[in-house]
Amino acid sequence: MKIAISMLLLTIITSAWAQEKSQSDLGGLLPADAKVEKLAGGLQFIEGPAWMPAGFLVFSDIPADEIKKWDGQNVSTFRAPSNNSNGNTIDGEGRLISCEHSGRRVVRMEKDGSLTVLADSYQGKKLNSPNDAVVQTDGTIWFTDPPYGIPKGQKQEQGHNYVFAIDAKTKELHAVASDFDHPNGLCFSPDEKKLYVADSGKPRHIRVFDVAAQHTLENGKIFCAIDKGVPDGIRCDKDGNIWSSAGEGVQVFSPEGKLIGKILVPEAPANLCFGGADGKTLFMTARTGLYSIRTNTTGARGIFQGGTR
Ligand code: MG
C-alpha cells in the first residue's frame, strides 16, 4: 500500500514537473534558459516590429508619429513623421511596407527612401486606418483595415472593416473578407496555403482560411481564442505554430490550434516578429517597452525577409 501511494506521488510530482517544464520552454520552442529581456523603454505606444535585411529592427511608435530603429544598442528615429504608422512588414525585395493610421493608407519605402502609396481608397472611399500587413511570395500584399486609427474629426467611409489584398500584378485592391468585427494581425502558414487573421474586436479570436486562386479565401473557421486580452499582431514560425500577442504576453498555438504555452511579458505586447542575426529572436512591442526572447525557431519566411510569416 505504502509503495503504491509513493508511486502515485512520484507520478504526480513527475507529471507536474513535466508540465512546468513544457510551459517554460514551450515544448522545445524556447531554450531552457530563455528569458524575456527589456531592450528599450520610455516609448509611448509601440507596434509593428519588422526586422530589416540590413540587420536592425524597426517599429512604430504610433502616438509619437515616428518609425523607430533599434540597432542592437540604441533606439533612434528611422522615419518621422510616420503618419502614425502601425503595422510594418518587409516585402520580397527587402522594402518596408507600412500601414498608416492618420494617412489612412498603405505605403512602401523604396530603396531611395521615397514612399509609394499602394492603397488609400476602395470603391472611391477612403480606407479606415490600415493596421497590419503581410506579403505573399508572389508579391500580393494582404492587409487589415479596422477603424481604430481614424483621426478625430474624420469619418469612417467604408461600410465594413475589410481584409484586403493588393494584387501583385494588376496592383488592384480586392476586399477578401468583410465579416470581421476588427480584423488586425495576419500571417501565412509556411506553405502559404493558409491565412490566419486575428479579430481583436468582440470575438477575440484568430480565424484561419484556405487561400484559393485569385486571392480569395475559403473554408474560414475559428483557429483559436485568446483568453486574456485580445489577439493583435500574430506571426507563424517555420513549423506552422502561431505566436499571438495577448493581454499577459504571447500565446503560442500548434498548427492544430492547441495552446502550447505562454510567454509572460511585463507589459502587454501589441505585436511581435522574429528577427536578429540568426532569425531566432522574438521581438515584442509592448506599450512603452521593447522586449525580446531567444527562441529555437525562426519565422516562417526565413531570416532576411523579415521573418514576418
Ligand atoms: Mg495591430
Where are these regions (language model features)?
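A short beta-strand motif characteristic of beta-propeller blades
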Residues: 36-40, 74-79, 116-123, 172-177, ...
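Blade/loop signatures of beta-propeller domains
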Residues: 19-35
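Short loop/turn segments immediately following beta-strands, especially the blade-tip
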Residues: 209-216, 295-301
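Beta-rich, blade/repeat-based domains predominating
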Residues: 40-56, 81-100, 104-105, 123-143, ...
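A short loop-to-beta-strand structural motif that recurs across blades of beta-propeller domains
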Residues: 66-68, 105-107, 162-164, 205-207, ...
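Blade-level signature of beta-propeller repeat domains, shared across WD40, Kelch, NHL, RCC1
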Residues: 271-309
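Beta-propeller domains
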Residues: 56-77
